[in-house]
Amino acid sequence: MTERQVECVLIEIPQGSRNKYEYDKERKVIRFDRMLFSSIVYPCDYGFFPDTLALDGDPLDAMVLMWEPTFPGCVIDVHPVAMLDMEDDKGRDEKILCVPQRDPLWNYIKTIEQVPPHLLKEITHFFETYKNLERKDVVVYGWRDLETARKVIQEAKDRYTEQKKLSNQ
């Protein structure tokens, strides 16, 4: 088996929150963006991989399975395990599912097959419905395996590096 990949995730939104926080690149702070219009809460900690660029122009999204929620601005070393393939009004919007490297309640999980099936359904349902009352369309295509997640992470890192090179010219 290949060695487990360790990545860094910056948390914007803790599990159980209806508040949508976003990282403000210019000010280098976490800002309150809005409260979700629906009476549902984030099913896991949510943030992004620093120094990445996803297809939607933002850093690549990450979800981290935690026993207890963390806080906006918390940095966690994680192992990717899968990817939720979806699209929103800005286009493709992949989200990488991760487990904390140093949490014995979750870090045994290496692949999507080890994630509790009902939890995957809850996460899918959240992303299918969380923008309904805003009248924004979201399409969830389904879960993808670890290899797909790794590929998308590497592509987002490469895209970020390329953009940084171009902006320095």
Curated annotation (Swiss-Prot):
Mg(2+) 2 binds at D61. One of its GO terms (cellular component) is cytoplasm. PROSITE patterns: PPASE (PS00387). InterPro entries: Pyrophosphatase, Pyrophosphatase_sf. One of its GO terms (biological process) is phosphate-containing compound metabolic process. The keyword Magnesium applies. Gene3D superfamilies: Inorganic pyrophosphatase (3.90.80.10). Mg(2+) 1 binds at D56, D61, D93. It is an enzyme of class 3 (hydrolase). Keywords: Cytoplasm, Hydrolase, Magnesium, Metal-binding. Disulfide bonds: none annotated. GO terms for molecular function: inorganic diphosphate phosphatase activity; magnesium ion binding. Homohexamer. Belongs to the PPase family. This is Inorganic pyrophosphatase. It comes from Methanosarcina mazei (strain ATCC BAA-159 / DSM 3647 / Goe1 / Go1 / JCM 11833 / OCM 88).
